[in-house]
């Protein structure tokens, strides 16, 4: 294992896990998402290039990937800095920033935000989905990809000495591509060398998380230090969810605040409401999985920011936690989800 054993690595350097505080395990603070632009229907075509205004805000909320400006979160650093200060004032301590190669990771900006706000920021190493892989990435062997991941954690990312503290979010499509499979195998190998936390973005199919875990296990990953993201848009059947939970990864519900009629990336999915998410957390807790749950908002478009009438980074602390208590989830379980589980996950073995 690496010299980071027993520590958490932030963009400002290693810290003890007791310094984390309330932790959001899946956010973005500076990224671009043009890779996932969805052209709007012809009658609404002009809205794709329109600025985000009060009069079209509802449309943008329902069609977040069809407005080009909305996909450029990296333009809102000043607003995000102010939001992080509000997050800290609400009792927040740390944010895991899951932007990886392919969606404009900017570790220099993350360091600046950490210095300005006092929030611990943990950056992610690795690669997003195949659609963002460069020809160079696709041509790499598993061994070469492993070396990239290890170096981003031990040496620094993007030509800097600013180091990543997790591997992820590692992007997976459905069906999984050969390039993504190699990245998963490299992730497992790098994790076995480093003892580091891993975060996975599964494809949009309920079988995807199972396939990913199998590939990781076969390549030697530690599933107990792996988070499976986006379960709130991926597995809806309770029986299937329990089957997945038995595999031992952390179960991440990370779209709190996102409530929409149509999910643009998969029209077959009825995006759950926050009340639905809380019900699913309660179900998992009642089944004995309170030690494996983590939560977040996955803010990755402008409309989710307070500046644009969105829920912002403090939504879970300000609004979801009180509702969890109303719905019978104990403070002890809430503390596990927001404090203890992130500590265990983020600490290097």
Swiss-Prot record:
One of its GO terms (cellular component) is cytosol. A divalent metal cation 1 binds at residues 26, 28, 169, 298. It catalyses: N-acetyltaurine + H2O = taurine + acetate; N-propanoyltaurine + H2O = propanoate + taurine; N-acetyl-L-methionine + H2O = L-methionine + acetate; N-acetyl-L-isoleucine + H2O = L-isoleucine + acetate. A divalent metal cation 2 binds at residues 169, 201, 230. Its cofactor is a divalent metal cation. It is found in: Cytoplasm, Cytosol. GO terms for molecular function: N-acetyltaurine hydrolase activity; zinc ion binding. GO terms for biological process: catabolic process; regulation of appetite; taurine metabolic process. SUPFAM superfamilies: Metallo-dependent hydrolases. Binds 2 divalent metal cations per subunit. Gene3D superfamilies: Metal-dependent hydrolases (3.20.20.140). Its EC number is 3.1.-.-. Keywords: Cytoplasm, Hydrolase, Metal-binding. Belongs to the metallo-dependent hydrolases superfamily. Phosphotriesterase family. N-acetyltaurine hydrolase that catalyzes the hydrolysis of N-acetyltaurine into taurine and acetate. PTER also acts on other N-acetyl amino acids (Met, Ile, Leu, Val) and N-propionyltaurine, but at lower rates. PANTHER family: PHOSPHOTRIESTERASE-RELATED, PHOSPHOTRIESTERASE-RELATED PROTEIN. This is N-acetyltaurine hydrolase. It comes from Xenopus laevis (African clawed frog). The gene is pter.
């Amino acid at each position: 294992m690496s010299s980071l054993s027993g520590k958490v690595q932030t963009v400002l350097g290693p810290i003890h896990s007791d310094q984390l505080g309330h932790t959001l395990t899946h956010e973005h603070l500076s990224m671009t998402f043009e890779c996932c632009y969805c052209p709007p229907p012809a009658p609404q075509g002009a809205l794709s290039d329109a600025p985000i205004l009060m009069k079209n805000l509802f449309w943008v909320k329902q069609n977040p990937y069809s407005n080009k400006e909305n996909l450029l979160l990296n333009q809102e650093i000043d607003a995000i800095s102010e939001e992080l200060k509000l997050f800290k004032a609400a009792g927040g301590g740390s944010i895991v920033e899951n932007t990886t190669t392919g969606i404009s990771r900017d570790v220099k900006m993350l360091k600046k935000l950490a210095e300005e706000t006092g929030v611990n920021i943990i950056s992610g190493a690795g690669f997003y989905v195949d659609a963002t892989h460069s020809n160079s990435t696709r041509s790499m062997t598993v061994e070469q990809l492993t070396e990239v991941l290890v170096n981003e954690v031990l040496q620094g990312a993007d030509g800097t000495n600013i180091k990543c503290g997790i591997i992820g979010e590692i992007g997976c499509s459905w069906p999984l591509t050969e390039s993504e499979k190699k990245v998963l195998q490299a992730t497992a190998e790098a994790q076995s060398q480093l003892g580091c936390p891993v975060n996975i973005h599964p494809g949009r199919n309920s079988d995807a998380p199972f396939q990913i875990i199998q590939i990781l296990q076969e390549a030697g990953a530690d599933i107990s230090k792996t988070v499976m993201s986006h379960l709130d848009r991926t597995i809806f059947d309770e029986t299937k969810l329990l089957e997945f939970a038995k595999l031992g990864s952390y179960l991440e519900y990370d779209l709190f605040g996102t409530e929409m009629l149509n999910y643009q990336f998969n029209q077959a999915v009825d995006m759950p409401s926050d009340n639905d998410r809380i019900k699913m957390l309660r179900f998992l807790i009642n089944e004995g999985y309170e030690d494996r749950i983590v939560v977040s908002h996955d803010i990755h478009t402008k409309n989710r920011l307070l500046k644009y009438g969105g829920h912002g980074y403090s939504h879970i602390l300000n609004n979801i936690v009180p509702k969890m208590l109303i719905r019978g989830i104990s403070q002890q379980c809430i503390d596990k989800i927001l404090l203890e589980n992130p500590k265990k996950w983020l600490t290097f073995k």
